Amino acid sequence: MIDVGDLRKGDMIVYQNEMYRVIEANKHFMGRGSGLIRTRLKSVITGLIKEVSFSSGEKVEEADISFRKAQYLYNDGDHYYFMLLDTYEQYSLPAQELEDEKFYLTENLEVDLIFFNGNPVSIQLPTVVVLTVIDTEPNFKGNTVSGGGKPATLETGLKTTVPFFVERGQKIKVDTRTGDYLERA
């Protein structure tokens, strides 16, 4: 059992006898009494999103999942295909299951494939991935004074903010939890 106050984005839980992935978890505390934990849960089986409020101190069952190392191969628009590194078995996941993760997938990227009851249900990305900048504004002398950054589009379609010195064609490291630029690769 896991305390609802410890729920984070990406956690897998069992709620009302169905497995859900936590999309969002926000804590709200009132002046008196206990707080509320408002969550958005996505059913791994049906894909439906449910908003659920828990009282602080409640506990939910942690899903019995297993992780296996896999390599991302390709996608055909509807499904993303992965190969287990130990047995070379191939599995596919529907595109709607990988809403945020798809922006970090490049060919041959190693990920953890998440299994529930023997079936793949999701992936866990590495914390940092290397992506190529395909579109950004050119750098001009003197524009670093203001700090901040400029918008950039990466090879997977992810849009992020990069420092002014980053140019088109450069490889950068991106945090998969937030989508933020970390450093040049």
Curated annotation (Swiss-Prot):
The Gene Ontology biological process terms listed for this entry are: peptide biosynthetic process
Q: Which SMART domains match?
A: EFP (SM01185), Elong-fact-P_C (SM00841)
Gene3D superfamilies given in the database record: 2.30.30.30, Nucleic acid-binding proteins
Tell me where the signal peptide lies. none
Q: Which InterPro entries match?
A: Elong-fact-P_C, NA-bd_OB-fold, Rib_uL2_dom2, Transl_elong_fac_P/YeiP, Transl_elong_KOW-like, Transl_elong_P/YeiP_cen, Transl_elong_P/YeiP_CS, Transl_elongation_fac_P
Q: Which UniProt keywords apply?
A: Cytoplasm, Elongation factor, Protein biosynthesis
Query: What coarse category fits the chief subcellular location reported for this protein?
Result: cytoplasm
Task: Supply one GO CC term from the record.
Answer: cytoplasm
An MF annotation (GO) of this entry? translation elongation factor activity
Which locations, inside or outside the cell, does it occupy? Cytoplasm
Q: Which branch of life, at top level? A: Bacteria
* Pathway given in the UniProt record: Protein biosynthesis; polypeptide chain elongation
Point out the coiled-coil segments of this chain: none
Residue ranges annotated as transmembrane are none
Q: Which family does it belong to?
A: Belongs to the elongation factor P family.
Task: List, alphabetically, the NCBIfam families matched.
Answer: efp (TIGR00038), PRK00529.1 (NF001810)
Query: Briefly, what is this protein's role?
Result: Involved in peptide bond synthesis. Stimulates efficient translation and peptide-bond synthesis on native or reconstituted 70S ribosomes in vitro. Probably functions indirectly by altering the affinity of the ribosome for aminoacyl-tRNA, thus increasing their reactivity as acceptors for peptidyl transferase.
- Full protein name: Elongation factor P
Q: Which organism is it from?
A: Petrotoga mobilis (strain DSM 10674 / SJ95)
**Classification of source organism:** Bacteria, Thermotogati, Thermotogota, Thermotogae, Petrotogales
Name of the encoding gene = efp
